[in-house]
Amino acid sequence: MPTRPLALVTGASSGIGTVFARALAARGYDLLLVARDGARLRVLAAELATTGASATPVVADLTTDAGLAVTEEAITHAGRLDLLVNNAGFGTKGQMVDSPLELQDQMLRLHVIAVNRITYAALQLMKPARRGGIITVSSVASFINSTGNVNYCATKAYQRSFSEGLALECGPLGIRVQALCPGFTHTEFHQRMSDDQQGRAPEWMWLSADDVVQSSLRQLEAGGATICIPGAQYKVAVFLARHLPLWVKGLMTRNVYKRD
């Protein structure tokens, strides 16, 4: 009988996903690591093995039916799952009408369809066990409407709403659910954004990936609120976003991306 808990992390090959994998290995978890980049996954798995964790790479493109099927099969084959981290995601550049439609479709599949299907597969194991945890990495963007990020904000809002509803359903089953809503975080994702024409957000707005992940895990382990917003600056920003008129929020988000 396995004695170590098992976690599955999507988007594990870089950024917040890699940090989650390392943090969970340090907490005694074995891991299923899901991403498209098999080479990076194998390097990460070897690194985690030095800590005593068993880490299995699952090479899958979650924007495709084949990739989702591979991931669902990995969950079913494991026969147990203690924690799911829905982390895989990406953003597009430019206004909705100017962004390639194929990329927007892929974002919808990754942020919505993949999250739903992988969570469904995980719950088939968690519900009978009456325990488990599900973290979906949403964003503070889920609380705003930002020009140049329309579908990103919309799909992140889906993830947050999905998690809030799921928490109500799963709480009585002993399954904890969290929507992690970080702001700007020092990762490859935001480095690509900050090097682009949109410019760089002020330094005080940036978080470390380690702080984001530790905030998430501490809150989940403590049985805290469903919504996790790391950083005092973002707690204030979300409070304002929930109470200010849409046109004011539009001005705020435009100023954030203004060039220095």
Task: Identify the residue ranges that each predicted region occupies.
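Conserved NAD(P)H cofactor-binding loop of Rossmann-fold oxidoreductase domains
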Residues: N87-T92
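SDR active-site lid
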Residues: A167-A232
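Active-site helix of classical SDR
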Residues: T119, T155
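Conserved glycine-rich Rossmann-like NAD(P)H-binding loop of the short-chain dehydrogenase/reductase
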Residues: R27-L44
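Conserved glycine-rich cofactor-binding loop
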Residues: S13-S14
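Substrate-binding pocket helix/loop in short-chain dehydrogenase/reductase
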Residues: Q95-L108
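Residue(s) in the substrate-gating loop at a strand-loop-helix junction
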Residues: S139
